[in-house]
Amino acid sequence: MKYSANLTALLQTDTVLVAVFEDGSLSPSAQQFDGQGEVSALLKSGDISGKIGEIATFRRQNQRIIVVGAGKPNDINERQFKQITQKAFQAVKPTSAQTLANALTEVQINGRDLYWNIRFGLETIAAESYIFDEFKSKKADPVKLRNVIFHADDKQAQLAVQHGSAIALGVKLARDIANCPPNVCNPNYLAAQAKKLEKQTALLTTAVLGEKEMAELGMHAYLGVSQGSKNEAQLSVMTYKNHPDPHAKPIVLVGKGLTFDAGGISLKPSADMDEMKYDMCGAASIFGVMNALVELQLPLNVIGVMAGCENLPDGNAYRPGDILTTMNGLTVEVLNTDAEGRLVLCDTLTYVERFEPECVVDVATLTGACVVALGQHNSGLISTNDELAEQLFRASQQTQDKAWRLPLSDEYQEQLKSPFADLANIGGRWGGAITAGAFLSNFTKQYRWAHLDIAGTAWLQGANKGATGRPVSLLTQFLINQCQ
């Protein structure tokens, strides 16, 4: 699907979206199509009242006019605008429409501008049109719509389309990878995707470390997790260089890539274990962000790292009670093999020191405790640097890819003490999301660091089961902000 913005398409597309409000008022474009009272008649007859998400349709010559209820004028928030856009697009999908003029750009959203309206609308439409049927013998009927033209034409509108299109593609690619079954998407598959991206642009190169290279570097915590799997662990490093100063320090993004996590010897319950293919959503999101970077060609140096691995029970699997030596020399007593993500990440976070980063942000489906604490709407944010934390929080608010900061203080380190090693890999029952972050902080002393726990936001359950692509939007916005 292609997206653009101009003011000339309103009378040229086969389908148009216009808004009406609860007080009976019409948006400017709705007024334009009310020349013979068609829109007003829908309101008078009660076919539509203007409440959020209501839909009514009429034809005018060769055009299909979809009238969308937009609630109370000048009192519409982001969540309501998303509902308006979703309902509108759901009305378009089953039709034969191929070109759509979207005049919902005229809906005013509290505290937001036209740029935000267009970009958020575009990302919402892209999400609503997402289909993943690669492994179905009978494919879903494709959406006939080919072009969406937003009714606006200034520099901010064009920028919104550019940013939104790149982010929407990044989200789609992240979802595609995450939704793949684990017998397809293993660590080698992640590495192959990174190598494929390298071939698409001169701005990005990819290097892949296998288990031999990791062993030489002393990444024994990472390798300990991988012991039970026949699929070799792979650390995929994507280096994007486009800063005017080639020596500028890179921003490093690290994604946990457990392509399947059975829990190891500390085996997970069988119920919903299939969802543990989503334990690589952190890595998938980093891949999506790097794709968005390539599309936008932002003037930055960024390194994206996907830490691919599997955690399976086997005669060679690591055990509760094992003590592993990490890359930075600290030893870790394994009390639970299902707290494996932090073991993969701690060595990866040590590895990226070599890049002398401006900052490091890791993304991981790390703890069920974070889901208990924050639910499925906000990712958990932990950081040792207030400025970096604020930058990420601001990006989350800009995009509605929400995150909420959790505390991190020395008291939580007390829970990680072990009588036999420098650290234990779990910190007991309380504050599990925070103690996981506290564990990681021991490996981030050389740079500014933040951690996003996406265990509650990376995928949906139930009827809409599947990966969400979060936090691609948040992280891409964070990078865009670095250029301003």
UniProtKB/Swiss-Prot annotation:
Q: Which InterPro entries does the UniProt entry name for this protein?
A: Leucine_aapep/pepB, Macro_dom-like, Peptidase_M17_C, Peptidase_M17_leu_NH2_pept, Peptidase_M17_N
Query: Where is it predominantly found?
Result: cytoplasm
Give residues annotated as binding Mn(2+) 2.
K256, D261, D279, E340
User: According to the UniProt entry, where is the signal peptide?
Assistant: none
User: Which Pfam families does UniProt cross-reference here?
Assistant: Peptidase_M17 (PF00883), Peptidase_M17_N (PF02789)
Sorted alphabetically, the keyword list is: Aminopeptidase, Cytoplasm, Hydrolase, Manganese, Metal-binding, Protease
Membrane-spanning ranges: none
Q: Which cofactor does it need?
A: Mn(2+)
A GO CC annotation given for this chain: cytoplasm
Q: Which reaction does it catalyse?
A: Release of an N-terminal amino acid, Xaa-|-Yaa-, in which Xaa is preferably Leu, but may be other amino acids including Pro although not Arg or Lys, and Yaa may be Pro. Amino acid amides and methyl esters are also readily hydrolyzed, but rates on arylamides are exceedingly low; Release of an N-terminal amino acid, preferentially leucine, but not glutamic or aspartic acids
Q: Which GO terms describe its molecular function?
A: manganese ion binding; metalloaminopeptidase activity
EC number per UniProt: 3.4.11.1, 3.4.11.10
Cofactor, how bound (note): Binds 2 manganese ions per subunit.
Q: Which family does it belong to?
A: Belongs to the peptidase M17 family.
The role this protein plays is:
Presumably involved in the processing and regular turnover of intracellular proteins. Catalyzes the removal of unsubstituted N-terminal amino acids from various peptides.
What is the name of the protein in this document?
Probable cytosol aminopeptidase
State the organism of origin.
Answer: Actinobacillus succinogenes (strain ATCC 55618 / DSM 22257 / CCUG 43843 / 130Z)
